[in-house]
């Protein structure tokens, strides 16, 4: 692969509580998955992140979530399709206003946390999520897991789907992410993470937790902004990709 996008979850602080180094990450990534206030992010924080992203030419994506501030959007919620559609439309609309005020726009949509994992297999929520994005703007790409039910629903509506891989998350043999509730679900060794990203991007393969090698399709690589050592990890991944001749460029 000659080029790949590098994305990170940003804007996840709230009030006086900060999470991660948004400014440092924005100097590294090409796309910013900005929280929309449902799992994290107050309006002032989200505005600042949009302004900082716009100043650097980093694409802004709406990272939509269940309405779950207390659980950081990492708890499954059995929400109705009608409510989920409205919630997602609301979040995209709110971030779009902040991005527009910063001289930019929302370029794509990515589900967060438990919603991301749910729409891999949950048909009702996958179709609701896709319907919400389509209702707001049929031209908006969606970021997610290749082969997911969500991608199928999105493609039925004509939405562009962008498969991503996670630099610092462990994979199951079936290609899904290992739950954060399980041991070793998040990787921390910088060199190991950089090497596996090269394998995913250049060779389309990644080692699963059982030791098997599984195929993976990737147009964007996610480096989590809230992980310990996030800036160091993202820097190492970027440097390694560039050293391998891969161009870092947004997909949107």
UniProtKB/Swiss-Prot annotation:
GO terms for biological process: carbohydrate metabolic process. Its EC number is 3.5.2.9. InterPro entries: Glyco_hydro/deAcase_b/a-brl, LamB/YcsF/PxpA-like. Gene3D superfamilies: Glycoside hydrolase/deacetylase. The keyword Iron-sulfur does not apply. Catalyzes the cleavage of 5-oxoproline to form L-glutamate coupled to the hydrolysis of ATP to ADP and inorganic phosphate. Belongs to the LamB/PxpA family. This is 5-oxoprolinase subunit A.
